[in-house]
Amino acid sequence: MSIVIYTYHNPYSLKENQELWNEIVNCPYFCVSQTLVNGLKTLYGKDFQIGRVTTVKNLTDAVYKYWTGTACAVKQHTDIDNIISTASERCGLNANKVENIRKSFLFNRDEVFNSIRTMFELRMDPHNIVEKYLTPEQKFIVFIFNEIINSTKNKDFVLKEDFTEQEIDEAVISALQIAKDNSSNASEKVVISEFDHIVIHGVHQFSPLMLRTIEEVAKYKKVILLFNYQEQYKNIYQTWIDIYSSFDCKMIDFKGNEFHPTDSSTISYEGNMLAQNMGKLLEGRKEDITVEKPYEIIEFDNMTEFAGYVAKIFEEAERRDPEHPMSAMNEQIYAADSSANDILKIYFPEQFGERQFLNYPLGHFFIAVANMWDSETNGILISDINDIRECLSAGILVETSPGRLASTFGKMESLFVGCLSVDDMLSRIKKVRKNKKFISDDKRLEYVSHISYYAVTKDEINELEQALNDLEELASFFYEDFEKRPNNFKAFYKKLKQYLQEEILDERDLGDEFIDIINRVLTRLDEVENIDASASFECLKSTMSLYLVQETKPGKSANWIVRNYEQIDGDVLRTAKDSKSQIMHFACLTDEDIDAVKTREFSWPLNADFFEVAQNPVDWKYQVFVKARKEYKNFKRYALIYGLEFNKGKYKLSYVKRDGDLEREPYYLLKILGIEKKRNIDRIINRKLADVSDIQIKDSSLGTYSMYDYYRYRICKKRFLFETLTEGNTVYKDEFLLAKYLEIWVENEIKESMQGLPGSELVLVERINEKYDELKKYFPF
């Protein structure tokens, strides 16, 4: 095995160490992330061409193409699902425990799937797992693992081994070619003069598949593992040494000058000094620390306020450069907790990658139909009326004009409260039609005109009725008797592909962009349509995000507005080119966000004890993987100091004070060094707000308004908009308001019919019950 580890000291001075530079400049080069690829290209230009340099993920995907493909994932899901569904007490647990664990495993299908794949990727031997140290859930997953190994399903989980040299060469070339094809410089000639070794740069979190790739490539080529190391900050960089020591191979440190900030006139000096002081603090050299003034840190009260701050920066950049807003941001934000993206995704969806097929109305249609289908009754079972709304809004079912079905359903939605099937809905529609037909009293017609589902036309009712029948028929076409058919996945994929091709692409007037997306979904379906697999309907539904997704289009990947700390190592190199205008903003600086690992180290139900107590293999890949997972808690601290140390521009620090009811303080190292909190709200409180108090409706048609219209306008302008300008009537749609309306209707008719008559409580109660029984037919829900 030919693996060697190199360390360097200064990322800006790789060229200065000629021996190291000569080894890495002409060979295939694989970085931990695309940001590191971009940073090296920005800093070193043509020496790091895209096409010679790409990501490690591209390499692993090329070496294990089938294993990382959709067909393999779907087949493995079906195998695992079938074993879970048929598990019994022979797994070593009592019947009650087996049933409970089966349910939890089926609910957490994706986690279980990832855990099983990890076990195969690490070549675990079930005989080396000590059962007495396992939890019941871990015993169950080991049982599944054993069942796969000892059955014909094993062939679906075999990773290719014993590659030939030609196959490895082809995989490396393929990975580089994919990167070149997806870049803007696809026509540039790329020269790789040395093919006998490769470089893998900056990896801290090694996956089992990455380690298998390194092992296979190292059989024929020298593999250089490269990372930055600062001897002056041994405690900070110990996390890297601990991981790379597990490779049990030669480690060579290419000496160079350690970085020390000396020029106080540079704009990056204060941030560089902060990194140095944090490093000295962690090295126990507190007496060497000098802090001229407290470091400023911005305080955001909550994550929403932080997201609002980021949104303003992004909007300004978007105005300057609508085509490339991310590069136009003068403040790049890196957060130890990047959940602000969940908020920003709502306001700037186009930034987070191409919209997936399942996020389009057509995709919502397939999700909604699958949610409603009940394989036990072999029909639609409505547990959430919103699924019906999604189906009617998708544009799949026939309607006179786009959106009319959704509009009709909106008027009639309260009628369907409590409906569990399409037949229930059709039955209530039938009652409404019958009631409308037999109302002859003008006064009663006036009363029902205020009930939303009586305010629909005959044509609208007929159209909705037909759509519901078509929906049931379409659901049956896809899913009827699904679990009774052999190779049911294969049959379903063929039907789905046929429907998308013949009923959607050929029959519908679609935009070019959506046609392109559907064609790429069909390409994905080509991968899986010949899978000989049978599993439960729930398994089919849970894998929908694997097969109903378009193939990735070059240039359409996500551009996260708030980046995580894994992106710092590459982006910091880009500050060397534009140091005056760039600000690196390090956010979410609390102990909870820096030191704590919010994501689990291992996928459920595996944990540290499973890897470290229940077994003790000596394989280096196993040791590296487990050590890397355990060391992730130290990575963010390293990344923060690395970013501050090598940043050539300005910097900002911030933290989010509240996480739910929990109040947090800034990161402890910053507090020790001395910080001054600046509340973000205080920075913006005096900002002048635009006057929006006098919003006018322009070019609106004038009409004659009744006394009731003026009354509505004075009480509630929103009701005036809906009832006078839009609907022309007061119509009640809400279940609560309709119940209240029935109460008032009964009261009014009783008062009118008993006016002037002697009354008694007994007679009154009797008349109320009679009137209620007479009128409740108008409220079938």
Predicted regions and their residues:
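Conserved helicase NTPase motor core
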Residues: 128-247, 299, 552, 582-584
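Basic/charged alpha-beta structural segments of nucleotide/phosphate-handling enzymes
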Residues: 34-40, 44-192, 396-439
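ATPase/helicase motor core of nucleic-acid motors
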Residues: 47-52, 61, 285-294, 315-456
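Helicase P-loop NTPase motor core
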Residues: 1-28, 33, 253-350, 371, ...
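Conserved helicase core region in the C-terminal RecA-like lobe
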Residues: 54-59, 197-205, 331-333, 542-603, ...
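C-terminal, charged and often intrinsically disordered regions of DNA end-processing helicases
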Residues: 667-781
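Accessory C-terminal helicase-associated subdomains
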Residues: 431-573, 741-781
